[in-house]
């Protein structure tokens, strides 16, 4: 047997837990004789799962890194508008907050620096400042010390977004250790969310590979590995599936009903979610009057702990059954919400035992098509909007929706009056919709989808060989 190669799996935050701790990723790596150590900056105790881990203690970025990170994003979006003559990149900007003195000073600094550096040369300097500053931190020094002690063959970061990933990656590069990062989500690259600069990049698909080179032309094709994402692998693991009777009994569901899943978004993406859920309830009631026996399972966005749905859940408690995601809340920010292995099982069984999903442009379309089930996208604005300047048109104008080969990949709910008829059509025969959705799934994620972890390990092996 070949000697074991030690691979550090860097978890700068909890975002990568689902893909790289709660999937088959670890098991497959061990079967390939890798020594896997999770370099863990999350509160989650991976040792309780039987994994080897090194806890990162007191990780802290340079005081200016967050400012420069935001400057970098603003410059990239500005240059994308100019280079590609496409104003969609303006829509990825978050409005500046001036609610506190500290926030006001920070945003003034960001905007001032951005104004002076909004060129390709300026962007390159900002990227350099980030690296130079991070190399002065205690976090960088401790990371380097850890790497010298353990000498891994490679450092693989689970997410390209967090600034807390910069120092460990730089420390590895400065020691000549190969580094890689995984692009976390299908919509990340057009948003200018990438802060890590590694030796190699692991992407979902050829489409994402093209995006990576489109937005970051300094990345060579040889640095990119198309692997797919472990995000959807759980749908192909039948050991997670409960019988319909078991699932319905466990969550007090009615065996006489067929359920439709309403999948919520975060409050920024869809501030009117609760009103769309109410429209779905009214449509389901119409269908039940025609002889259908339907209910609704509501799965909220895992990072949405708000009370904005309370009124609709109470008003229609005879129709809606909420099944909250089993995520752990460690802090108030969205990236301190940690996924759990139990939630993967809940999500898989929710999909397996519902007829279809309704949402606003979510990647749940791919989770459902993995089970050969359709998705309906909401495509209208409610009359009394929570935020007057918000519109569904903004959502579907985002770049990642341009990957859709055919608009027939989903059912489009263009008004409240259309919901009942579209759902009825899907319940009677959804084969064409599912077929087109499957084609879209193949565009955004390398197939077979169940072999993503296998391809990632093969790519790691190729890099270190």
Residues covered by each model-derived region:
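Conserved N-terminal ligand/cofactor-binding loop architecture of enzyme catalytic domains
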Residues: 32, 37-140
């Amino acid at each position: 047997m070949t000697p074991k190669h030690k691979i550090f799996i860097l978890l700068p935050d909890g975002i990568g837990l689902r893909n790289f701790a709660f999937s088959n990723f670890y098991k497959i790596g061990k079967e390939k004789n890798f020594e896997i150590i999770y370099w863990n900056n999350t509160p989650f105790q991976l040792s309780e799962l039987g994994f080897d881990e090194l806890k990162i203690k007191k990780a802290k970025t340079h005081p200016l890194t967050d400012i420069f990170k935001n400057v970098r994003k603003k410059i990239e979006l500005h240059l994308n508008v100019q280079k590609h003559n496409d104003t969609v990149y303006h829509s990825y900007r978050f409005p500046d907050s001036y609610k506190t003195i500290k926030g006001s000073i920070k945003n003034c600094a960001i905007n001032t620096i951005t104004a002076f550096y909004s060129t390709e040369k300026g962007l390159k300097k900002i990227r350099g400042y980030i690296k130079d500053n991070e190399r002065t931190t205690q976090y960088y020094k401790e990371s380097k010390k850890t790497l010298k002690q353990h000498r891994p063959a490679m450092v693989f970061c689970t997410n390209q977004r967090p600034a807390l990933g910069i120092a460990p990656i730089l420390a590895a590069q400065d020691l000549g250790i190969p580094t890689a990062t995984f692009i976390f989500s299908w919509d990340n690259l057009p948003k200018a969310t990438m802060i890590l600069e590694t030796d190699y990049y692991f992407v979902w698909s050829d489409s994402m590979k093209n995006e990576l080179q489109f937005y970051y032309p300094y990345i060579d094709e040889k640095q990119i590995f198309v692997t797919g994402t472990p995000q959807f692998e759980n749908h192909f693991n039948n050991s997670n599936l409960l019988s319909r009777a078991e699932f319905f009994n466990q969550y007090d569901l009615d065996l006489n009903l067929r359920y439709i899943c309403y999948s919520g978004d975060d409050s920024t993406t869809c501030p009117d979610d609760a009103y769309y859920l109410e429209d779905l309830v009214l449509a389901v009631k119409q269908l039940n009057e025609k002889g259908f026996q339907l209910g609704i399972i509501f799965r909220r966005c895992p990072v949405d702990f708000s009370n904005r749905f309370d009124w609709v859940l109470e008003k229609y408690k005879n129709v809606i059954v909420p099944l909250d995601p089993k995520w752990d809340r460690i802090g108030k920010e969205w990236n301190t919400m940690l996924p759990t292995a139990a939630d993967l099982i809940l999500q898989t069984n929710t999909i397996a035992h519902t007829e279809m999903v309704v949402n606003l442009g979510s990647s749940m379309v791919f989770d459902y098509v993995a089970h050969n089930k359709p998705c309906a996208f909401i495509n209208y604005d409610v009359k009394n909007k929570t935020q007057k300047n918000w519109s569904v048109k903004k959502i579907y104008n985002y770049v990642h929706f341009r990957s859709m080969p055919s608009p027939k990949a989903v059912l489009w709910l263009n008004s409240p009056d259309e919901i009942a008829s579209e759902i009825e059509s899907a319940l009677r025969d959804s084969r064409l919709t599912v077929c087109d959705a499957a084609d879209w799934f193949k565009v955004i994620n390398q197939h077979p989808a169940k072999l993503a972890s296998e391809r990632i390990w093969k790519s790691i092996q190729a890099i270190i060989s």
